[in-house]
């Protein structure tokens, strides 16, 4: 029993998989706390509707109202815009969605079952019609416009200051 001069080293060795499994519950709880609202306009088709108070009401540097009036006006504008949007969407969103669903359903049906078959039929007939149309154009319309061009090209217009 003497004095020991060696240093002891102690370490914990964990596999990376064990480490990740022990952290997962903590990370998943944090992810649920800070999840953002879903983007309801992912394609930004209503960018022109993102209007704020400063986009509608602007005071030039030479004419400013009192700060409290400006802040109160801004708050009133945003609050009224918010309330009326919520009120109108509450009253009109479901009926408008129903009507638009019917309209787009009918338009899709017409396009799929009427417009596209008729278009395909015309595209099948067009090569033969194109030959006939080119012949009619070459026989009647082209000579007419060539002669009109030659006749009208000899007209000269002079302007005078009187």
Swiss-Prot record:
Residues on Cytoplasmic side: 1-86, 108-162
GO biological process, one term: caveola assembly
Subcellular compartments: Golgi apparatus membrane; Cell membrane; Membrane, Caveola
One Pfam family cited in the UniProt record for this chain: Caveolin
Keywords per UniProt: Cell membrane, Golgi apparatus, Membrane
One Gene Ontology cellular component annotation held by this UniProt entry: perinuclear region of cytoplasm
Superkingdom of origin: Eukaryota
Family recorded in the similarity comment: Belongs to the caveolin family.
Keyword flag Membrane: yes
Lipid bilayer topology: Peripheral membrane protein
Gene expressing this chain: cav2
Non-traversing membrane segments, not crossing the membrane: 87-107
Organism: Takifugu rubripes (Japanese pufferfish)
Name of this chain's protein: Caveolin-2
Free-text function comment from the UniProt entry: May act as a scaffolding protein within caveolar membranes. Interacts directly with G-protein alpha subunits and can functionally regulate their activity.
